[in-house]
């Protein structure tokens, strides 16, 4: 069939098709009807009449597609016809129900998009703030520099009719993704957008009111890993279920039918109850996760869908099935579909109506798919046999790939500007311009947007406002989100159980520390500590919400762009699910601690205790979320939150009474959620409680005038709240005198605690609605200063082309690889699934030889990646059976090092540039005998070959932040990292997945050169073009279940391969057909692929298998005697341990230096804490209350170190993931990483400690005149304590494999650090069980003993009048004569000695003696802290060793 005819037929189909976007289910059609193929629903007569017409149209469609099959094998399958019929019936029923058509075309005129130039996007580092500050004093920098810009898109004009499909093709950097984002109305990341985009006549500005009707689906997959496939899809349906459904059709029925349809359509119905999973949680395969992404986007029911490389990770058959489903939905539902593909087959290409080819942001072709190839042929280019049309269209822009026809040399376009000029001068361009003008006039006359607007309003919930962009109402969104959030939590039962188990364990620890507090003066003091500790416990436990907030940002951004729900609804749902979780948590904690504490045994007080703690926990949880939602970086929010927590702890009334607070920070007492919770809990416990002090009253001993004990009438309690003539302290009096709390305010304080919760809810709702920190699927490159390339410059473009051309012509043909023969035999691999074993690989055998390229193919889920993991010795879980040999010998210890493995996941350290990442690999993995200059030269060669020269000084970055190289560029870097190592054997897992055709061609050609030079390699490949496929020598084809279908030669023009299948009864492969697609079709690959032949059984009976086994035996018997190592001594690592350590340490310093958020975040934390603490405890004097303030000052310093643990732990966990990837490839051993990450923290820790010291030490009045040794001791012991905390955080991170486990473990360990340090609970009151070992093994105890004895050793105490405990003196003796205390001193408070004042201490030494501490132990304290620090380093090294291998 002629391509022009095909185009006209599609036009007819579009004009005759239905017009409603919404997927409505015909009444009477059940799930089983779709799955079984039933197509006779029981409906009214008029519907039957329409069925007859539909059947007639279906026959015509079958005839049309059958004809197309004969030409290009892209016809619809039986399932495709069922799908088409389903949509046609749905459309017909929707129209009969009064629905209006939503025919929204796209018209783009003169679209120019301006982006920020990379020359001013310089990599940030620790010097960036200093450089900025210095620039303020340079007049030459005061003039505002004009930001360099470049055109991402340049004057692009095109259109796409409703119901049509537009294919966007272009090499990386052509602007394809930008165009798709602009069509979906995502404009925020660009400097300017000029030109017009109209949606069915609606301007782009007005289109903002219809968010979700044009969606952009990026190539990466973002899903909640603990949700099942069904739950993920059902949630999307709940948010997008239209109001205008069929009569009497319930929402649940509608969702079930649509869910069943889509799951069947994309072949994941068998995985409906499987969790989605991610890189850490086992779930769907990569291909299945991609299908789920596509399914979720389809549920959005958008009028216009933009698909950006959405087939990445799918095999060729599944990609074709996906494209067919888009074609059917476009035809029947009149969806306007725009898609970009990097490697599209002709079968996929022919499904589209028009194609737009971009190069460097310029349009070089826009028109029918059937005329594109001829257009470029007419320009003077030639197309290789079997080369797909899409590959040809993008290849003509690459000087290394294009073929110029004889006689056209020097006449064809060379640069993007040349191509654009040629296109604009063509007759076809003028014809497309005429068609676009006519279409725009037609839109003005017909005004389809009026029906669109009416239908959009009809589909919305009736409770929605007219301006709402959402389908469902706010309450419906909240309900759906509540269910989903509950499913997310329930899906991760391990985390849920771990959380509650941690709470129970810690509650028993807390309860035992403050066990059975008595109603005496010691119980009076410790009750406040116990209640404060209860609040603090829940605060630390809530910090995990900070990490959860950042983790879910990308998913929230994606679903918000689909207009599924308001972000504020998302937060409300979180709040609602918080309530039962927090209630259970607090109740489990309270039921233990309340009664172990010995608090008042009254039901009312117990439930008030629980209710207040619930409010405080809810408020704290939402406070952490608020700081996460308001911050661009996790490190920023963490460090700011540390300062805020210090503030909250200092100003809640526990450590500093209200009347002792200085005015500059005293206001925070009222702006502190902890204040009201603490006041309420203290009032709840103290308001009806009296404390006896008969054994602790003063004066004590014997009256000097009588020789008898002092009469009780003159004795008073030595406590705040004491009153004359009584040996009891009323709790309410104590609250007022000591803390200035009113016990009558309990109810008010509880109410205000919950008001704080509400306030933080509102802040979060506003933050998530109006702030967006994710990149939305795009990346911005940053370069070293002065290293950014020039963009869209014709001369620069020619220069780059010449570099690549030269590199291609000067491929290192003399390169000698030391490859060997690698064989595998009877490979079986099983993994535990529940109580059974699942077989993933079943008797797979084969080999790779020097000089040969072997392709590993099969449908998604066939076990290709699993086989590579097994062969490359990367599997650490499950059971592997079978034999593997290298040169006929068992694999040596150096196998992983000499093997290059390009994995699917592109794991790279974001703090390095591309060149640094490649050089690091070359330095550590090439033989040490190779000079550094040679290694660097080879790196440059690889950069040129892979067209990454211009990216050499670009930061790798991360996709989450949107700063760094793109997805496609990461894949090239992954390959480059392995190639620069000069491996002896190369395994590549989908090296071309996500790459454009030209990059794929370059990579495969480069790999071919490596093979020709003697390297054996095997490569999984999903969607190979005919040209790429012909580079391979052999193929191993797997069926689902890991069974072999074929292993053998491909043959010239694939004849050997295709003849094998033809002999089994498969139709012949045509001359112009892609052999790779042919064999996948023959073996039933794809979503709905079917085959009646049991190919694994056919293979087992084939003579080819017998030949394979004979060859295997021969290869193993004739194995070479040479070792894999040229020196004859296998080494696990190429370089020495000390060289590794030096290189890893240098790299770690670069990474930290380029992470100002982390480094300055820690410093900012120290500055904030130092200023807060210093000015909180401003200029302390020598009164007893000021002495207590000194103790609490040091306690705040203690908390700084503890909070620093959280910050360090996050960084360690991130770096550990990169280490595991490096270790698997034997870059370096576990020891260099462990010791480097410990050493790199030291200077930053010293700076943090010193900053805190200088900000607070003099401010708080702790400087001791003439005691320089004591002043230095304060600094040095604090620095060593911070060393301990940093290494402690590293040890926790080293033993944990993911963040949640670490966040669960940290509070459990921290409780021992601060509870048993000797301040919150004096040593004399610590239970014997804990004191016997935990107290003496607590490093914080030695820090507190050393620093407190140092501060108080020479401190004299002179009580102020307010600090004195007053009692009457009925005698004529002076106060000093009347009562001689054991500690402290007595003084006159009146001139006549009638009233005496007792000061409990007269020196700081007396205080720390009561804690059983001594100043003579200061040296010992430092020594023990150093010992704990060294022990932590030992733990870090040990745990890094034990967890060095990833679980896979």
UniProtKB/Swiss-Prot annotation:
GO molecular function: ABC-type transporter activity; ATP binding; ATP hydrolysis activity; ATPase-coupled transmembrane transporter activity
Topological type in the membrane: Multi-pass membrane protein
GO annotation, cellular component aspect: membrane
Region (Disordered) location: 16-41
Pfam families, sorted: ABC2_membrane, ABC2_membrane_7, ABC_tran, ABC_trans_N, PDR_CDR
Intracellular or extracellular location(s): Membrane
UniProt keyword terms in alphabetical order: ATP-binding, Membrane, Nucleotide-binding, Repeat, Transmembrane, Transmembrane helix, Transport
The keyword Zinc appears for this protein: no
UniProt GO BP: aggregation involved in sorocarp development; sorocarp morphogenesis
Segments forming a coiled coil: none
Keyword Phosphoprotein: no
Taxonomy, superkingdom: Eukaryota
First-listed, main subcellular location of the protein, grouped into a coarse class: membrane
Transmembrane parts of this sequence: 494-514, 530-550, 579-599, 604-624, 634-654, 663-683, 748-768, 1157-1177, 1191-1211, 1233-1253, 1272-1292, 1299-1319, 1422-1442
Family statement: Belongs to the ABC transporter superfamily. ABCG family. PDR (TC 3.A.1.205) subfamily.
Protein's recorded name: ABC transporter G family member 9
Organism of this sequence: Dictyostelium discoideum (Social amoeba)
Upper lineage: Eukaryota, Amoebozoa, Evosea, Eumycetozoa, Dictyostelia
């Amino acid at each position: 069939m002629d391509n022009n005819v095909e185009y006209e037929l599609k036009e007819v189909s579009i004009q005759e098709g239905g017009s409603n976007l919404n997927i409505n289910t015909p009444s009477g059609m059940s799930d089983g009807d779709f799955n079984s193929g039933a197509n006779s629903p029981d409906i009214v007569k008029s519907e039957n009449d329409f069925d007859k017409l539909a059947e007639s149209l279906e026959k015509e469609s079958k005839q049309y597609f059958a004809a197309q099959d004969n030409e290009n094998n892209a016809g619809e399958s039986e399932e495709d016809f069922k799908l088409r019929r389903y949509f046609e019936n749905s459309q017909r029923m929707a129209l009969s129900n009064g629905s209006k058509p939503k025919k929204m075309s796209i018209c783009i005129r003169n679209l120019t998009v301006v982006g920020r130039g990379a020359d001013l996007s310089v990599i940030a580092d620790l010097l960036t703030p200093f450089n900025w500050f210095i620039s303020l004093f340079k007049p030459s920098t005061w003039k505002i520099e004009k930001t360099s810009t470049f055109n991402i898109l340049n004057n692009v004009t095109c259109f796409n009719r409703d119901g049509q499909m537009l294919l966007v093709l272009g090499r990386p950097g052509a602007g394809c993704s930008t165009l798709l984002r602009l069509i979906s109305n995502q404009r925020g990341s660009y400097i300017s957008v000029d030109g017009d985009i109209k949606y069915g006549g609606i301007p782009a500005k007005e289109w903002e009111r219809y968010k979700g009707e044009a969606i952009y689906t990026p190539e990466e997959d973002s899903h909640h890993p603990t949700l099942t496939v069904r739950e993920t899809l059902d949630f999307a349906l709940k948010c997008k279920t239209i109001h205008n459904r069929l009569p009497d059709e319930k929402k649940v029925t509608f969702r079930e039918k649509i869910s069943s349809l889509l799951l069947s359509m994309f072949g994941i119905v068998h995985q409906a109850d499987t969790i989605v999973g991610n890189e850490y949680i086992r779930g769907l395969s990569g291909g299945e996760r991609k299908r789920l992404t596509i399914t979720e986007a389809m549920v959005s029911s958008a009028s216009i869908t933009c698909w950006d490389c959405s087939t990445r990770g799918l095999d060729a058959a599944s990609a074709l099935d996906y494209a067919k489903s888009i074609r059917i939905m476009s035809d029947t539902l009149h969806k306007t579909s725009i898609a970009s593909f990097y490697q599209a087959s002709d079968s996929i290409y022919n499904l589209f109506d028009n194609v737009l080819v971009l190069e460097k942001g310029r349009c070089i072709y826009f028109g029918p798919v059937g005329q594109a190839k001829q257009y470029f042929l007419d320009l003077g280019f030639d197309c290789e046999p079997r080369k797909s049309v899409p590959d040809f269209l993008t290849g003509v822009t690459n000087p290394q790939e294009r073929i110029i026809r004889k006689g056209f040399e020097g006449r064809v376009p060379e640069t993007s500007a040349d191509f654009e000029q040629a296109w604009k001068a063509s007759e076809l361009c003028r014809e497309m311009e005429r068609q676009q003008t006519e279409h725009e006039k037609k839109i003005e006359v017909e005004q389809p947007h009026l029906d669109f607007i009416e239908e959009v309003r009809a589909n919305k919930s009736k409770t929605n406002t007219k301006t709402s962009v959402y389908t469902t109402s706010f309450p419906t969104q909240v309900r759906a989100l509540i269910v989903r959030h509950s499913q997310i939590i329930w899906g991760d039962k391990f985390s849920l159980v771990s959380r509650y188990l941690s709470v129970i364990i810690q509650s028993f620890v807390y309860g035992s520390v403050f066990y059975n507090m008595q109603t005496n003066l010691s119980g009076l003091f410790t009750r406040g500590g116990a209640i404060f500790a209860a609040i603090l416990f829940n605060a630390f436990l809530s910090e995990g919400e900070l990490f959860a907030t950042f983790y879910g940002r990308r998913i929230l951004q994606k679903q918000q762009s689909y207009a599924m729900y308001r972000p504020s609804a998302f937060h409300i749902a979180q709040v609602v699910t918080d309530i039962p979780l927090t209630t259970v948590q607090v109740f489990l904690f309270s039921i233990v601690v309340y009664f172990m504490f010995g608090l008042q045994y009254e039901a009312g007080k117990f439930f008030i205790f629980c209710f207040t703690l619930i409010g405080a926990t809810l408020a704290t949880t939402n406070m952490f979320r608020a700081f996460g939602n308001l911050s661009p970086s996790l490190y920023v929010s963490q460090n700011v939150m540390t300062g805020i927590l210090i503030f909250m702890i200092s100003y809640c009334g526990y450590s500093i009474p209200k009347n002792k607070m200085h005015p500059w920070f005293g206001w925070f007492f009222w702006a502190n959620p902890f204040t009201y919770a603490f006041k309420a809990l203290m009032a709840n416990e103290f308001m009806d409680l009296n404390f006896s002090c008969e054994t602790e009253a003063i004066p004590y001993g014997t009256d000097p005038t009588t020789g008898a004990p002092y009469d009780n009438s003159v004795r008073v309690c030595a406590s705040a709240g004491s009153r004359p003539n009584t040996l009891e302290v009323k709790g309410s009096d104590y609250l007022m005198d000591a803390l200035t709390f009113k016990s009558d305010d309990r109810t008010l304080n509880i109410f205000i605690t919950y008001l704080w919760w509400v306030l933080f809810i509102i802040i979060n709702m506003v933050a998530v609605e109006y702030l967006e920190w994710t990149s939305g699927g795009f990346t911005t490159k940053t370069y070293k200063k002065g290293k950014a390339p020039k963009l869209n410059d014709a001369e620069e473009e020619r220069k780059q082309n010449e570099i690549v051309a030269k590199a291609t012509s000067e491929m290192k043909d003399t390169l000698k690889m030391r490859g060997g023969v690698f064989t595998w035999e009877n490979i079986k691999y099983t993994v535990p699934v529940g109580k059974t074993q699942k077989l993933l690989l079943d008797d797979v055998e084969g080999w790779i030889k020097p000089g040969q390229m072997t392709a590993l193919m099969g449908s998604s889920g066939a076990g290709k990646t699993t086989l590579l993991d097994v062969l490359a010795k990367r599997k650490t879980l499950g059971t592997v059976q079978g034999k593997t040999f290298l040169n006929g010998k068992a694999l040596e210890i150096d196998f992983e090092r000499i093997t290059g493995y390009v994995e699917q996941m592109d794991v790279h350290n974001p703090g390095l540039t591309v060149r640094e990442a490649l050089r690091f690999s070359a330095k550590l993995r090439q033989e040490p005998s190779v000079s550094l200059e040679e290694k660097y030269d080879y790196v440059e060669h690889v950069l040129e070959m892979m067209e990454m020269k211009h990216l050499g000084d670009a930061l790798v970055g991360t996709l989450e932040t949107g700063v760094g190289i793109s997805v496609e560029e990461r894949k090239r870097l992954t390959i480059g990292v392995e190639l620069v190592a000069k491996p002896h054997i190369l395994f590549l897992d989908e090296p071309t997945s996500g790459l454009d055709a030209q990059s794929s061609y370059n990579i495969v050609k480069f790999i071919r050169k490596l093979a020709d030079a003697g390297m054996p390699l095997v490569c999984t490949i999903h969607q190979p073009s005919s040209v790429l496929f012909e580079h391979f020598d052999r193929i191993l084809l797997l069926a689902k279940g890991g069974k072999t279908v074929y292993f053998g030669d491909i043959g010239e023009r694939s004849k050997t391969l295709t003849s094998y299948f033809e002999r089994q009864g498969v139709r012949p492969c045509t001359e112009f057909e892609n052999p790779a697609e042919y064999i996948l079709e023959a073996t039933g690959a794809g979503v709905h692929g079917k085959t009646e032949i049991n190919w694994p059984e056919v293979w087992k009976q084939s003579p080819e298998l017998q030949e394979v086994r004979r060859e295997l035996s021969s290869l193993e018997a004739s194995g070479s005697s040479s070792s894999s190592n040229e020196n004859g001594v296998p080494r696990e690592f190429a370089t020495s341990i000390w060289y590794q350590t030096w290189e890893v340490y240098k790299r770690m310093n670069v990474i930290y230096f380029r992470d100002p958020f982390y480094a300055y975040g820690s410093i900012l934390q120290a500055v904030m804490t130092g200023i807060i603490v210093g000015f909180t405890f401003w200029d302390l004097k020598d009164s007893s209350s000021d002495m207590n303030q000194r103790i609490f000052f040091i306690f705040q310093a203690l908390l700084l170190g503890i909070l620093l643990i959280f910050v360090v732990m996050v960084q360690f966990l991130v770096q550990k993931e990169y280490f595991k990837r490096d270790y698997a490839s034997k870059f370096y051993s576990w020891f260099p990483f462990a010791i480097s990450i410990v050493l790199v923290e030291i200077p930053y820790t010293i700076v943090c400690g010193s900053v805190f010291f200088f900000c607070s030490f003099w401010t708080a009045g702790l400087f001791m005149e003439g005691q320089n040794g004591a002043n230095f001791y304060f600094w040095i012991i604090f620095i060593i304590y911070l060393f301990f905390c940093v290494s402690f955080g590293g040890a926790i991170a080293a033993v944990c494999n993911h963040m949640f486990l670490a966040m669960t473990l940290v509070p459990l360990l921290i409780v021992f650090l601060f509870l048993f340090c000797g301040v919150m609970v004096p040593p004399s009151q610590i239970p014997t069980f804990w004191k016997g070992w935990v107290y003496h093994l607590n490093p914080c105890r030695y820090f507190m003993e050393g620093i407190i004895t140092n501060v108080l050793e020479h401190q004299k105490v002179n009580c102020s009048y307010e600090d004195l405990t007053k009692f009457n003196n009925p005698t004529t003796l002076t106060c000093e004569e009347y009562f001689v205390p054991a500690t402290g001193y007595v003084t006159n408070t009146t001139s006549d000695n009638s009233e005496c004042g007792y000061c409990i201490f007269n020196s700081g030494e007396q205080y720390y003696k009561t804690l059983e501490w001594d100043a003579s132990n200061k040296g010992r304290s430092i020594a023990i802290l150093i010992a704990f620090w060294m022990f932590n380093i030992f733990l870090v090294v040990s745990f890094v060793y034990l967890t060095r291998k990833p679980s896979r």
